[in-house]
């Protein structure tokens, strides 16, 4: 009888353990279906700036390690060749060129993404994710230009477009106000020293870079770029500001601030699914890396900033590993647009470039409709699901919205991500074709099917003298065979009118939507 009872208890315990194990396995499976997601977006870093893409002069071992465990793309694209429209399209899945107010945002610009617009962050939050935005923002704040309450709660802001937590730069490193904004309030602001910002006229008594070069103790501006106004941290910027002395950032600590906040976000949310956008400031101007990177590249501040970016990647990967969630975290590493070497500060970037080619084999760079303007680095890593490799699939950042929604098993609501398409299999390395075509903007519009690229006529300048970049604008139609002429040297429009007509029709159809 006793043995029967024991056997009965044992059977019950075994059944209970089996049920518990089954529940645990179901929970693990459930968690595996909902990976953490990180968008890690560099600033002005080109395809050729990374050693995994062939750089022999700059070594980025952490990015290499990420590429070795994921899919490295050779034909990935941002939607635009500058920051604001690129990030707008990334978050909204909407072509920035459909609106006329998505150009490079001033430091006091109103928020480009309106609260009523669905975003990828909204989608993740609706799926039960905790969402965060850290670092470079450059999408404006408040409801109109100049409408920010810099000394109070700034609204609308990231929380109005899907982000539970935010720690962002108000604009860019070279534009005032040079402060951190955490959850829509300026960090370390002394109420007795309120901030004032203007993009119209200077404040009396506040020194300007153009008048007081002796105060520019760190970097001096290149002529005619506009970086000669308010002086912050020994560097002159675009725009005017006064006050907020206690809240001003130190440029050498920007990467540390962004990285530490990202690591802390990971630590705080390791037990729940999260979506984290990290926008680095590297390698945007002004380039003033932390002392531990200074001189390490042999290429001056820009090269050192690339090493600093690689460090950020390594710290984020390390935080995921320490938290035990690296296996089930999907990381998308990319850049907002192509590279620029001289973008307004006398940091000897051109002089010290040597044999380094930030643009890789492509023509142009930031601001350009040629390939180097929008053909950017991209790596997708998800150790639990993604088989390492290299993909030549044609992919665009605009499709990350719809593709992540597909990953979540959540159909996009009406009006959400109107230009975003589900190419999840391409991002995960399973589909080696990707998109049928990509449409991009930089002064003029272009459309490419991966082999042929058409650039619409434009009255814009063909060459930017200040940045030494070919912009790609021409009054003539342009057609390039990217398979045979990756450097876009020979315009074949006159020789292949039928291909021009085909691609032009695609572009006109997109414009009519």
PLM features per residue range, with description:
Residues 2-13, 17-478, 486-512:
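Formylglycine-dependent sulfatase
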């Amino acid at each position: 009888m006793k043995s029967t009872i024991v056997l009965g208890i044992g059977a019950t315990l075994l059944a209970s353990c089996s049920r518990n194990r089954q529940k645990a396995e179901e929970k693990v499976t459930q968690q595996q279906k909902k990976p953490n997601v990180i968008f890690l977006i560099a600033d002005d870093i080109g395809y050729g700036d990374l050693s995994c893409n062939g750089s022999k002069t700059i070594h980025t071992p952490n990015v290499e390690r990420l590429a070795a465990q994921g899919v490295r793309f050779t034909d990935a694209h941002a939607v635009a060749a500058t920051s604001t429209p690129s990030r707008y399209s990334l978050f909204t899945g909407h072509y920035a060129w459909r609106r006329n107010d998505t150009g490079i945002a001033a430091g006091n610009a109103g928020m480009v993404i309106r609260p009523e617009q669905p975003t990828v962050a909204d989608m993740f939050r609706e799926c039960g994710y905790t969402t965060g935005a850290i670092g470079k923002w450059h999408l404006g704040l408040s409801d109109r230009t100049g409408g920010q309450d810099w000394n109070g709660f700034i609204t609308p802001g990231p929380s109005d477009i899907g982000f539970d937590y935010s720690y962002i730069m108000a604009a860019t490193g070279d534009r005032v106000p040079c402060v951190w904004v955490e959850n829509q309030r300026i960090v370390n602001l002394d109420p007795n020293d309120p901030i004032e910002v203007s993009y119209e006229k200077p404040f009396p008594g506040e020194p300007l870079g153009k008048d007081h070069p002796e105060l520019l103790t760190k970097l001096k501006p290149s002529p005619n770029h506009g970086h000669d106004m308010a002086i912050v941290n020994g560097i002159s910027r675009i725009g005017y500001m006064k006050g907020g002395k206690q809240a001003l950032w130190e440029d050498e600590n920007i990467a540390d601030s962004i990285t530490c906040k990202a690591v802390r976000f990971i630590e705080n949310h390791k037990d729940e699914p999260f979506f984290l956008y990290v926008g680095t400031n590297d390698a945007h101007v002004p380039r003033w890396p932390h002392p531990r990177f200074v001189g390490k590249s042999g290429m001056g501040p820009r090269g050192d900033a690339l090493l600093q970016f690689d460090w950020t990647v390594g710290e984020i990967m390390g935080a995921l590993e320490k938290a035990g969630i690296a296996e089930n975290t999907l990381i998308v590493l990319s850049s907002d647009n192509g590279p620029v070497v001289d973008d307004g500060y006398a940091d000897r970037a051109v002089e010290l470039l040597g044999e380094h080619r930030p643009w890789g084999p492509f023509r142009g760079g930031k601001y350009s409709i040629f390939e180097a303007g929008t053909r950017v680095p991209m790596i997708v890593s998800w150790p639990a699901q993604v088989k390492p490799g290299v993909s030549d699939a044609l992919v665009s950042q605009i499709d990350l919205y719809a593709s992540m929604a597909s990953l979540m098993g959540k159909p996009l609501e009406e009006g959400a991500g109107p230009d975003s398409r589900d190419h999840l299999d391409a991002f995960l390395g399973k589909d080696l074709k990707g998109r049928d075509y990509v449409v991009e903007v930089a002064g003029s519009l272009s459309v490419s099917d991966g082999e042929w690229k058409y650039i619409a006529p434009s009255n814009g300048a063909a060459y930017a003298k200040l940045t030494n970049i070919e912009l790609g604008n021409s009054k003539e139609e342009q057609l390039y065979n990217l398979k045979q002429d990756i450097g876009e040297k020979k315009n074949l429009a006159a020789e292949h009118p039928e291909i021009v007509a085909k691609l032009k029709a695609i572009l006109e159809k997109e414009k009519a939507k």
